[in-house]
Amino acid sequence: MKRTHTCGELTINNIDQEVILQGWVKKIRKLGAMVFIDLKDRYGITQLVVDQQHIDLINNVKNEYVIEIKGNVVKRKSINKELVTGDIEVIVKELFIINKSELTPFVLENDVNVNEDTRLTYRYLDLRRPVMQNNLIIRAKINHIIRNFLTDSNFLEVETPYFAKSTPEGARDFLVPSRLNKNKFYALPQSPQLFKQLLMISGIDRYYQIVRCFRDEDLRIDRQPEFTQLDLEMSFATSEDVMQISESLIKKILKEVKNFEIKEPLLRLSYKDAIDLYGSDKPDLRYDLKIHTLNDIFKNTNIKFLNNPDLFIRAICIDQLLSKKQLEDLNQQAKQFHFNSIAFIKFENNNWSGSLASQLTENEKELLIKEFDIKNKATIVLNIGKYEQISQLMGAIRISLAKMFNLETKDDFKLLWVVDFPLFEFSEQENRYVAAHHPFTSPKEECLTDFDTNKKDALTCAYDLVMNGFEIGGGSQRITNPEIQQRMFDAVELTTQQVETNFGWFMNAYKYGAPYHAGIAWGLDRISMIVTDSNSIRDVIAFPKNSLGIDMMSNAPDLVSEKQLEELNIKIVK
């Protein structure tokens, strides 16, 4: 039989109709001579009623069995307002077991007390939980909004290759050996960057793609070895054009998915100010907690360890009194950043306490009250160090304080652009300057004359879209002048041979007329994670890898046969 309705469809308007439903048994309850079954599918839950006359139909039915029923829709005596179908129930006349189920390794409820690797091993069961299905539904809705919006904005969806040439700049590539071309390898692309720029030279004008990308890097809660991007590029466009259309798109997504309004234009914060105020280039603006530099306050201090004009005293003040346990947690965090501990000062009802309180002068106390606008109570957390290191520490402490005091408001979305990034960063490992983004990012106009000789101060036309402390998008104006591109290659010390080997095929296209262009890539996994309030991007991906990059369900990656290796001309060295 073919089902007439889903399990989330029947309402008061269907009373007295004969229906056929199919789904999984969520729960069986006996009440006197009656048996109640909650039947579930992706769309919802419908309550079934089996009376004494048909009780034999369910003798062998258990939870998670897949069944089919025929019955009549009646009005429920007790309404369940939590269900769309809560006004009705179905009196079962016929029941057929489609497939049985063994006892599941964990309860398939939203709140489940089981470790993540077990969930990933039985991912097909984990995905039966409503919260997981809702995550995938929201993700699909986001993709649908993106496609409609960009198509309506004259963007063309174009697919780019998954088998590409390895370009060693950046993260590690996943390599794929070629059987037909012995001893040669494809790389799975870290992004479609070069291909989408070639599409601009091809005259496509406006391109987008929802694309899978691959990076062989260490994992964390917001990273996977394979991930999904919204990738787009615009010809005859500047950074402003890309940022404007990005703002309109994210505004539409949040409105349609969360009914949340954002105001345009978004706040813009320079990289320098982001680090100075928040200790991060992706600050969470749902809470304030700005970082202050206190060198002027303590310039004549008697506190010995703060008396070093070559270092920076950085501090955060929160209008709470931290407990001994909370301070110890921050001390442990400081050690992760190679600081011995943090210092703290407490203020309550005009009384000062803490590790530095007894050494404070009256003038320093007055200046601290003024600096942080302290009212009744506060804890100041501070330390001293080189600017970059101490800023990173205080940025991490800022996040920890927000978690301690529940300042990360749910269903609130704070977005901003971080701009004016450094064009280069110095690699201690390679002992040279490398491109902070990628070597095709244009320097800012005011840096064009000396970006390759004044690398320390050179800024880039790059921009990151940040939401609730996560970078959800990053893009830039591209270099389209071959002379400037060559200077960029020289600046990052790529030899003529390296450029020709890695990028010659790409650079050749610039001989034939390239429009100026700009673009951006969004991390759709991260956006979905934030919008669904999930703890990890693994909760918004159907079949993710665990924190070690392992597919617990299929046990990939795994060994392959000697024959397969031989065909690829590969020999394992033990």
UniProtKB/Swiss-Prot annotation:
Name the source's superkingdom: Bacteria
Q: Tell me which EC number(s) this protein carries.
A: 6.1.1.12
Q: Look up the record and give one Gene Ontology term from the biological process aspect.
A: aspartyl-tRNA aminoacylation
Q: Where does L-aspartate bind?
A: 169, 215, 437, 478
Cellular component terms (Gene Ontology): cytoplasm
> Which subcellular locations apply to this protein?
Cytoplasm
- Tell me which InterPro entries the record gives: Aa-tRNA-synt_II (IPR004364), aa-tRNA-synth_II (IPR006195), aa-tRNA-synth_II/BPL/LPL (IPR045864), Asp-tRNA-ligase_1 (IPR004524), Asp-tRNA-ligase_1_N (IPR047089), Asp/Asn-tRNA-synth_IIb (IPR002312), AspRS_core (IPR047090), GAD-like_sf (IPR004115)
- Is tRNA-binding found in the keyword set? no
Nucleotide-binding in keyword set: yes
Q: How does it assemble?
A: Homodimer.
Q: What family does this belong to? A: Belongs to the class-II aminoacyl-tRNA synthetase family. Type 1 subfamily.
Write the protein's name: Aspartate--tRNA ligase
Which species does the entry assign this protein to?
Answer: Mycoplasma mycoides subsp. mycoides SC (strain CCUG 32753 / NCTC 10114 / PG1)
